Amino acid sequence: MKPNAVKAFSLAVVLLAGPICSRAVTILSGPSFTRATNAPLAGVLQLATDVETRVSVSVSDGTNVWQRRFYDYATTHSVPLLGFKPNRTNEITVTVYDRYQNPVTAAQPLVFITNPLPSNFPNIVLLQSQPDRMEPGYTLFNVMMKNSTYWYVAIVDSSGEVVWYNGAPSTADVRRLDNGDLFMPWTTNFVEMNLLGQIVNSWVVPTNLPINLHDGVPTSHGTILYLSDAVMVVSNYPTSMTNPVAPRATAKVRYQNVVEISATNAAVLHTWTPINFLDPLRISYLIVNSLGSWDSEHSNAVIEDPSDDSLIVSMCMQNAVIKFSRATGQLRWILGPPANWGPAWQPYLLTPVGTPFVWQYGQHAPILTPQGTLILFDNGNYRASPFAPILSVTNYYSRAVEYSINEKTMQVSQVWDYGTTNAAQRLYVDHEGNAEPEPLTGNVLTDFAAVSYVNGVAPSSFGPTATMTRITEVTHDALPQIVFDLAISLYANTNTSYKDCETYRSHRIPDLYAHPAQPVADLSVTLEYGPPFLQFSADDTRTYVIQASTNLVDWEAIGAALEDEQQSGDFSFADVGAEALPVRYYRVLTQ
């Protein structure tokens, strides 16, 4: 549950005096491949060898050829194979290498035939893709259809092709853990699922603190944050969101607690009740009476701000994002339109400065960026607060927006947005969505989760309730450039009369596999030609620093290993400064 921080793993090796020899490797059993029961595009490769080996596979699916190299040495291998595409005949060629890089290839390739996607799977159409400008990796999302009566967790590549899916029973967010598994909320528990579709962990919450499916957040310190619904009775509650002189009455108001549990044993560690320091009588045009109570907050996200040990919560029905102290529950600020906040909350309202500036309405999924700004998905519901006039729904728009908050001056400025006049199309999403800043490119991946209007018109002849999804990646420029655009819908699906389709959030994941920092397992040093020559195989997503010593106590970094241009994962380093030394020790630090 903890993030995969950069770690230094090392292996010390004494200089060798000559070439390395070894006998041939023998494959004792296998290889065999077994399709995963709950992940139709994945499976497990198994084989055994007489000496410790690592595995490499080459897959030809009739259209493309791709490779995967694994760097764990063992005599018995059980390796998940991921990344197959539907409706393909895959030939899997298996090669094993011993610690001296001697290869043996299995006599015959394995054959894995993948089925077509299910008949009720949504239609995915790639509208644009520029892989050289995109954030590297794959796009993960949970797509819901038929009024949320069935759904699929799916992963697509940069060409929009499905490379993994599972009919997971969760209607909300799904996110990738650092170990490569998926984390998602159910109504009674959180689950961790690997990409073979197996549930490998579960956290059951107390019955009096049920999970609100909008969010579940594994933290860096071994806990899980989530939202939990509760109801309180208040007096003098407005009975109309549109009539300022309507009578007031005693009413039930629904709100969300913020709960923190242990990732070790699911024990409750903390509970916060934001409605206690907010105004339970404040209204917006979004608030509705449902399930026997007024949906006052509809909190949909909680995140940590580690800079001052505080929590940030998005309350879409309040058109507000709030920040409060984790330790004391003290309110820090309120981001959102100031209408209908009483005198007690005026000191906490952020004041907008600079132009352009537009408040967010019905927002989802705030994220703190490395620059300290706050980016979120602004749904844009109504674009007004009671009792001001509202626009026609055909004029609404949704966007990704980034704000900079100065807590000393209690001011907020708009840094960047995408989806207003700087977008090719004006999309409106009345619920769900997220905007995710990407770490390598700075691009922003935006999930227009449930599009009901495009340029003020329903996206299809089925009307605005037949929503579709647009997942768009744009550059973080004043005039953003689209580098990836994916449309997901049920419009062309004749197997269902329902045509609504939505994705709660989308995420760019760097790979289908995790890449933890691991020690190099096959470092060799030879003196046959010239200076000491170091060689090893390792994960090419990492960098490897060579350190040297003459006494195994004092170590000095002497350079970084270089990857072979022809063979990914093969690294080498020539120590040209070692010739005058009587003895030299080496170790490799994985970063």
Question: Where are the regions a protein language model picked out?
Answer:
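Bacterial N-terminal signal peptides
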Residues: A8-P19
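Histidine-/acidic-rich catalytic cores in large beta-rich domains
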Residues: V25-Q46, D50-V55, V59, S78, ...
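Short beta-strand segments within Ig-like beta-sandwich modules, predominantly Fibronectin type-III
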Residues: R68-A74, L562-Q567
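Short beta-strand segments enriched for Tyr within beta-sheet-rich domains
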Residues: F84, R88-V96, Y544, R584-Y586
